[in-house]
Every structure is written in C-alpha cells, then in structure tokens.
C-alpha cells in the first residue's frame, strides 16, 4: 500500500521541491500549510522581506497552493494561530521580559510545525503516515547510543540547530528529502522543471516579516531603567529591557567610555541592563536547563569529543560535559566563548550527529 506523506508547504522552493521529490519517489503526497497570522499584531507589510509570521501570509499560502496545483495533490490550510500565539509569541515575550534571549524558530519547530500542526490536521480528518519538510538535515535511526539527527550534506545550509529540541518520537515519522542535497542543486532542479518562480523567490529572513521585534511588545513593556556598569555605577538610561540582549553593542548610546561597552547581563527584577567591556562576556562554562538528550545517557559519545554551539551562526567550539543530570547539563569549552546568552539554545554535536540540546541558563 502506498504510504501517504504530508509535506509542510511554506510557499518556498525548499518545501516545493521536497513535495516534488517525494511524489517522484512514489509517495501519495498532500500539502499542509499552517496559518499563524491573525492580524492581532500591528505589523506593517515590508516589500521585499519574507518572514514566517506577518501580513503577507496570504501570498505564501497562494504560492503553496500553486505548488500543489502543479503536482496535482490536495492542499490544506491548517489554522494554528491560537497555538502559535501561546507557544511562540507569548513565550518570546515572556523570555525577553525576563531578560533572556529566546530563539522563536526553534520553539516553533518544537511546538507548532512538528506538534500542533499535526494535531490540527488530523482533527480536520487529514491522515498521513509521514510528515516532511524542506529542512536541510538528515535522519538515521540506528540504536539508542547513536544520534538520529545529523547535519545536512550542505553544511552551509544545515538546519539541525533549529531542529535540536525535537524528540525521537517527533522525528520518527519525519522525512527530510533535501538533507542529502546542496541548495544550489535544489534551485537548479527547480529551474530544470520550469519552476523558476520558486527558484528565484527570496528566502525567509526572520521569524517576523517586518524584522522589528518591538511590534510584538506593549507600550507597558517599554519601561525605562538604568544602564549600570559591572560595579553597579549608573551610566545612563535604557528604553526598556525588552530592547536589549546579552552581547549587544549597538544602540546603547553611552558615550565618554575608554572602550566600547556591551550588554553583559540583564537584571529584570531591578529593571537594569548591565554593561561592560567585551572581555566581560568571555565565558569558559555554561549551565543549561530543559535538557533534550538525543542519545542514551550511557552513550560513549557523550564522553567526547563534542562540538558546542551556543547560538545560531556560532562557529562552534570543542567542549566537554562536566555535569549531566536529569533536565540539566554543564559544559566547559576548550577556549573561552563570547556572549553565551541566557535563553539561547546550546546544541552539542558528536561529529555530524546531534547528541543533546538545552536552554542556556547561566
């Protein structure tokens, strides 16, 4: 019996080609597009920008439907705006209000794209054996001592960081058709089959379309407070802690200093933003919570060598695990790292495989 695959169609080239390739492989393919925009945020449409959440969602839905029409497959728009607000937007706001720096795309994958979307689709009567997306990542389930999520062949486009909070159960029925391809080859294939409109489409640049996170917050969040140095000396006034993140240098507007100042920490309880020199952001260890262990706790891979990433785009650092207990991990880097921000995701790799992820605490 032919297996049915639901492909998450975003309206972009990667998900479009994933659906095309799976159909060529003989799967019974249906398209799902999640609808997250409900107009509750006062966000301007910005021409030339693409984002996952914003007023141009209708255009992306139209593009997803165009893919489905070209392939002759059913297409369903699945409303998940309520879940998106609760699990992603409210979480994002709460983290910034607490002085932390969340990654909303990681959260969306964990809670919505590989969670609420599936449940909502099945409630609509849409049944499927597998779920596929256009993510650049690979899966290989061997045994509990080995990773099951691996970096993509195209390391420049690898998206395992975004997927690192997913469980084995969530990924057990997932397909990533592009994991063994390079992005240039995906675009070339799109052009080859006459889908130049998708090959040339601009990629999503941020989780919100306009790129300005301030639109997600209320006026009551913009509470001025003190900029202080590491000794507690007041240096000036900030515009509200939700406007700052650890490691930030631009937009501080503090003059008369011997060297550039950075955001070193944020004290939400005191409504203070602590500033200091770049050297004050150097750290050799991090502790992280909400541990997602992607191998058995007895796996020899945890003994190292490990490659630690403390944010998206971080080049990584050799590291070792100092402490590992239920829900918590402490890691030491081989060399000091810059600006490990609380709230960001720590991802540990053994070779190309993801062995663990957690939320940086301190």
Give the location of each predicted region.
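AMP-forming adenylation/ATP pyrophosphatase catalytic core
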Residues: 132-139, 143-144, 148-362
């Amino acid at each position: 019996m032919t297996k049915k695959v639901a492909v998450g169609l975003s309206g972009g080239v990667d998900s479009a080609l994933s659906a095309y390739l799976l159909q060529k492989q003989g799967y019974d393919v249906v398209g799902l597009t999640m609808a997250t925009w409900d107009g509750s945020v006062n966000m301007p449409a910005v021409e030339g920008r693409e984002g996952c959440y914003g007023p141009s969602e209708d255009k992306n839905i139209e593009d997803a439907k165009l893919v489905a029409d070209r392939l002759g497959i059913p297409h369903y728009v699945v409303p998940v705006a309520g879940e998106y607000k609760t699990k992603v937007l409210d979480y994002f706001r709460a983290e910034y209000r607490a002085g932390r720096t969340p990654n909303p795309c990681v959260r969306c994958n964990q809670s919505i794209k590989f969670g609420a979307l599936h449940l909502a689709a099945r409630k609509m009567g849409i049944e499927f054996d597998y779920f596929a997306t256009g993510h650049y990542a690979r899966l290989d389930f061997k045994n509990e001592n080995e990773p099951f999520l691996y970096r993509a062949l195209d390391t420049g486009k690898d998206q395992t960081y975004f997927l690192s909070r997913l469980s084995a159960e969530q990924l057990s029925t997932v397909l990533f058709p592009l994991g063994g391809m390079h992005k240039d080859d995906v675009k070339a294939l799109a052009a080859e089959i006459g889908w130049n409109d998708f090959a040339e489409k601009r990629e999503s640049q941020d989780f919100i379309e306009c790129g300005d996170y301030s639109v997600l917050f209320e006026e009551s969040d913009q509470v001025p407070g003190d900029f202080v140095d590491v000794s507690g000396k007041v240096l000036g006034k900030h515009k509200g802690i939700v406007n700052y993140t650890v490691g930030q240098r631009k937009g501080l507007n503090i003059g008369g200093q011997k060297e550039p100042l950075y955001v070193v920490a944020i004290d939400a309880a005191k409504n203070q933003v602590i500033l200091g020199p770049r050297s004050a952001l150097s750290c050799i260890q991090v502790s992280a919570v909400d541990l997602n262990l992607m191998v058995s706790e007895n796996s020899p891979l945890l003994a190292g060598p490990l490659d630690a990433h403390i944010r998206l785009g971080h080049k990584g650092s050799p590291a070792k695990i100092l402490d590992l207990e239920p829900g918590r991990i402490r890691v030491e880097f081989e060399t000091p790292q810059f600006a490990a921000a609380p709230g960001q995701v720590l991802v540990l790799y053994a070779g190309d495989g993801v062995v663990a992820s957690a939320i940086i605490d301190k």
